[in-house]
Amino acid sequence: IAVIIVILSGNLAFSQNAFEDALKKAASENKRVVIDVYTDWCGWCKKMDAEAYSNDEVKKLLEDNFVLVKLNAEGKDKLTYNGKKYTEEELSYYFEVFSFPTTIFLESDGKVISFKYDNYPMKNIPGYVKTDEFKKLLIFFRDGKYKDIDLSTVI
């Protein structure tokens, strides 16, 4: 399954067309979306899955505050975002993803969250993120700190 929604309540549950389902779930539950963009060959993606995404505190933060989606940056499955059809690969380009893994945050209405890092405007977090930093990252976005605080002061 190229695109999956992960519901973190102990076991991982997988669903087809999860991207659209995730956006609907986020809107109905007023939760932000975390998109984990990966490729099948990416060792750092697998490391982040095994460490950060498998951490109990991270799972709890995600379960309580976000809807998590995994997006295969080389996938060919068709998805709809903002009324337009994309392949997973096209959507990863739309989100300006050029390295893996990359983490993207969306508002509950599906809009990409922009934030600052070292006073530079960003729309995603490229690269592997250590578990402790990932927890801080989730809290930063959960609490809406991206509106006022530069992420570089947090991680």
Model feature map: region roles:
Residues 27-28, 60-63, 95-99:
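Extracellular/periplasmic catalytic domains that process cell-envelope and extracellular macromolecules
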Residues 51, 93-147:
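Non-catalytic, surface beta->alpha helical segment in thiol-disulfide oxidoreductase systems
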Residues 147-155:
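Flexible coil segments in periplasmic/lumen-exposed cytochrome c-class electron-transfer proteins
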Residues 55-86:
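Thiol-based oxidoreductase modules, predominantly thioredoxin-like and allied folds used
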Residues 1-17:
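Bacterial Sec-dependent N-terminal signal peptides
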Residues 46-50:
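Detector for the c-type heme attachment site
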Residues 16-33, 62:
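A short beta-strand-turn-helix
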Residues 29-43, 68:
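Short active-site neighborhood of thiol/selenol oxidoreductases, capturing the structured segment around
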